[in-house]
């Protein structure tokens, strides 16, 4: 309240001062008009004055109008002033002249009023010396006045700063030719403008200097280190740094769905296999067996491999899946996934480039997502009677982009169809039973190219079956007998060309053989018996119609080109250490083949020109099949004759 009362009092004082100023101004105006009227009466009209006298009277009248008396003596005549001839007068002390007359200006009188002492009036005193100006205050008559002195001013010229502006209008030059002097002037102006702009930029940079970052407390550091954003950032960054340390190529490649560039590098000519590289991690691969492998369709340089448990490390997870990268030379996996049961089968989820599916020894189906920074599965199936309760050796995603399912088969003969969006319960389930009483212990499964309904399976008894998912003949169909031991690998023909060979498939077994089959006949077309140990896996080339690869327990990789020879492999190589090779997988382009051994190592070989099909490979392979059928028919006839004899 005291502040408001003080403010009101201050406003009242200001209003009183304004009223006093107005009254003083009005009084002085009336006095001036009265003096003008008196002087007009005293003056006598002169008719024949000269122009000089007339101008003098006008000047005196003008001086009177502003409150200055014209009675002091005339000042010196005016001269043309320039900067060189300009002088300033300063105040010097002089004695007060009692005869001098004073006139106060209204503006000064009003501006000098202050406080409660009333208006303070300043007056101008004209001395007999016209170059001296005396200033006197009515309240300070005893003070000494100041005398004006002469001081010369030094002139300094500064060029005005040129402002250059541009517009988007069409500018047409007025003159097509300029003199050399004009051009030099323009260049000088441009250089000055450029220097000015550079100086301004430097000044701005100096002004915009960032303040030094403050030191984080220990609590803030721990909070950042354990935040989810930091973990995601760190997980991706360490992969980039590893690439940078091991590579000189584009380490910032992002897997965003772009087309794969053809792999650059030296391709070995001829039929010899050339070792490319080895994948092995001292922590995750040691003392583990490679149980399955798969190449990514979306990113052909990525390969996933599954491993069983490490008996020497009981505290480590039993099941491990590692994603390896062929594009970079780093020795660590791109992603590490694990679960609490040995992973017996694994594959990339087709149409879902970020998902990896695994089948475990316990019967669970697990799903990993590389977008999550977690290494454990993001989804898993329940261990219940509705799902699998036996080891799952077969996982496969079949269908199209808009309609696809995950097909899994366990060793108890149960086949389930799943949606990748929900693994809590299968969409369909079927018991693979032969003769409605004998469950099929499935060890391998394969779908023909372009078929999602019919498939073939291999069993522990050595028998091969055809099966169907839907229709009146759903379940086990035909029986193919020929192997004398468990079927370890089965694969359908994959190369697409002018002739359809999708009815062909090959199998491998513990009986040391690889057999060629057709779904049109329940007996093998041919048996390849060049191995001296268990044959653990077999796979057709994805691009060559007559080429397939197989691996055995002696660490040998064989490539068979049936157009060249059916008795011995076209190319063969034994890995270092002679460890048993468990799995073989072709890359999508058919130029590399990867094999996994019992020591947890993955070996990648370049196939070279052997894998490149010629235009006549399909017709040659068709003739080869005709010859194989003819030889089989002859052998069957000979066997029949011998039995009858």
Swiss-Prot record:
Signal peptide: none annotated. This is Cytoplasmic dynein 1 intermediate chain 1. It is found in: Cytoplasm; Chromosome, Centromere, Kinetochore; Cytoplasm, Cytoskeleton, Spindle pole. It comes from Homo sapiens (Human). Residues 1-58, 96-125, 169-221 are annotated as: Disordered. Belongs to the dynein intermediate chain family. One of its GO terms (biological process) is transport along microtubule. Residues 147-163 are annotated as: Interaction with DYNLT1. Acts as one of several non-catalytic accessory components of the cytoplasmic dynein 1 complex that are thought to be involved in linking dynein to cargos and to adapter proteins that regulate dynein function. Cytoplasmic dynein 1 acts as a motor for the intracellular retrograde motility of vesicles and organelles along microtubules. The intermediate chains mediate the binding of dynein to dynactin via its 150 kDa component (p150-glued) DCTN1. May play a role in mediating the interaction of cytoplasmic dynein with membranous organelles and kinetochores. One of its GO terms (molecular function) is spectrin binding. The modification N-acetylserine is found at residue 2. Changing residue 150 to W: No effect on interaction with DYNLT1. Keywords: Acetylation, Centromere, Chromosome, Cytoplasm, Cytoskeleton, Dynein, Kinetochore, Microtubule, Motor protein, Phosphoprotein, Repeat, Transport, WD repeat. Residues 96-107 have a biased composition (Low complexity). The gene is DYNC1I1. Residues 2-123 are annotated as: Interaction with DCTN1. The modification Phosphoserine is found at residues 50, 100, 107, 111, 114, 179, 197, 635. WD repeats lie at residues 285-334, 338-378, 387-428, 437-477, 482-527, 530-570, 576-615. GO terms for cellular component: cytoplasm; cytoplasmic dynein complex; cytoplasmic ribonucleoprotein granule; cytosol; kinetochore; microtubule; nucleus; perinuclear region of cytoplasm. Coiled coil: none annotated. SUPFAM superfamilies: WD40 repeat-like (SSF50978). PROSITE patterns: WD_REPEATS_REGION. Residues 1-13, 20-58, 189-221 have a biased composition (Basic and acidic residues). Pfam families: Dynein_IC2, WD40. Homodimer. The cytoplasmic dynein 1 complex consists of two catalytic heavy chains (HCs) and a number of non-catalytic subunits presented by intermediate chains (ICs), light intermediate chains (LICs) and light chains (LCs); the composition seems to vary in respect to the IC, LIC and LC composition. The heavy chain homodimer serves as a scaffold for the probable homodimeric assembly of the respective non-catalytic subunits. The ICs and LICs bind directly to the HC dimer and the LCs assemble on the IC dimer. Interacts with DYNC1H1. Interacts with DYNLT1 and DYNLT3. Interacts with DCTN1. The modification Phosphothreonine is found at residues 105, 176.
């Amino acid at each position: 309240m005291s502040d408001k009362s003080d403010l009101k009092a201050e406003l009242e004082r200001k209003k009183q001062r304004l009223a006093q100023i107005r009254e003083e101004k009005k009084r002085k105006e009336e006095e001036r008009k009265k003096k003008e009227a008196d002087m007009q009466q005293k003056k006598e009209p002169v008719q024949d004055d000269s122009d000089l006298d007339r101008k003098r009277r006008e000047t005196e009248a003008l001086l009177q109008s502003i409150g200055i008396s014209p009675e002091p003596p005339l000042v010196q005549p005016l001269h043309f002033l320039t900067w060189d001839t300009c002088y300033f007068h300063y105040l010097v002390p002089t004695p007060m002249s009692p005869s001098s007359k004073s006139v106060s200006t209204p503006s000064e009188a009003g501006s000098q009023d202050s406080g409660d002492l009333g208006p303070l009036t300043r007056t101008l005193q004209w001395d007999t010396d016209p170059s001296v100006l005396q200033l006197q205050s009515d309240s300070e008559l005893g003070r000494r006045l100041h005398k004006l002195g002469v001081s010369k001013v030094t002139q300094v010229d500064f060029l005005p700063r040129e402002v250059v502006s541009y517009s988007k209008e069409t500018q047409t030059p007025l003159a097509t030719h300029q003199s050399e002097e004009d051009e030099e002037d323009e260049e000088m102006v441009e250089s000055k403008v450029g220097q000015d702009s550079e100086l301004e930029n430097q000044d701005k940079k100096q002004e915009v200097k960032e303040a030094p970052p403050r030191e984080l407390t220990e609590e803030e550091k721990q909070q950042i280190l354990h935040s989810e954003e930091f973990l995601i950032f760190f997980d991706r960054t360490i992969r980039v740094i590893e690439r940078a340390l091991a590579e000189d190529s584009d380490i910032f490649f992002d897997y965003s769905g772009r087309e794969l560039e053809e792999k650059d590098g030296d391709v070995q000519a001829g039929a010899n296999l050339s070792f490319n590289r080895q994948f092995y991690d001292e922590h995750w691969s040691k003392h583990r067996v490679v149980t399955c492998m798969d190449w990514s369709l979306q990113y052909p340089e990525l390969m996933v491999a599954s491993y069983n448990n490490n008996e020497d490390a009981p505290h480590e997870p039993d099941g491990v899946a590692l994603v390896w990268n062929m594009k970079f030379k780093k020795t660590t996996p791109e992603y590490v996934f694990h679960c609490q049961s040995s992973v017996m089968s694994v594959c990339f989820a087709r149409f879902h480039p970020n998902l990896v599916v695994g089948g475990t020894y316990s019967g669970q189906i697990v799903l990993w997502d590389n977008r999550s920074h977690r290494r454990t599965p993001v989804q898993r199936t329940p261990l219940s009677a509705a799902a699998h309760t036996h080891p799952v050796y077969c996982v496969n995603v079949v269908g199209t982009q808009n309609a696809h399912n995950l097909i899994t088969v366990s060793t108890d003969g149960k086949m389930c169809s799943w949606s990748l969006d929900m693994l809590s319960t299968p969409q369909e389930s079927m018991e693979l039973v032969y003769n409605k009483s004998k469950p099929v212990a499935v060890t391998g499964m394969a779908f023909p190219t372009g078929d999602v309904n019919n498939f073939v399976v291999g069993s522990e008894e050595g028998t091969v079956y055809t099966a169907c998912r839907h229709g009146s003949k759903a379940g086990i169909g035909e029986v193919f007998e020929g192997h004398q031991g468990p079927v370890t690998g089965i694969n359908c023909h994959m190369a697409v060309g002018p002739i359809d060979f999708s009815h062909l498939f090959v199998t491998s077994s513990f009986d040391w053989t690889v057999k060629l089959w057709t779904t049109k006949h329940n007996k093998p077309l041919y048996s390849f018996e060049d191995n001296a140990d268990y044959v653990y896996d077999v796979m057709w080339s994805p691009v060559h119609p007559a080429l397939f690869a197989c691996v055995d327990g002696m660490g040998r990789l064989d490539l068979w080109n049936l157009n060249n020879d059916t008795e011995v492999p076209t190319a063969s190589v034994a890995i270092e250490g002679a460890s048993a090779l468990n799995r073989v997988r072709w890359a999508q382009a058919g130029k590399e083949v990867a094999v996994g051994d019992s020591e947890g190592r993955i070996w990648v070989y370049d196939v070279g020109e052997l894998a490149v099909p010629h235009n006549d490979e399909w017709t040659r392979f068709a003739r080869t099949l005709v010859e194989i059928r003819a030889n089989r028919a002859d052998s069957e006839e000979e066997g029949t004759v011998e039995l009858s004899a």
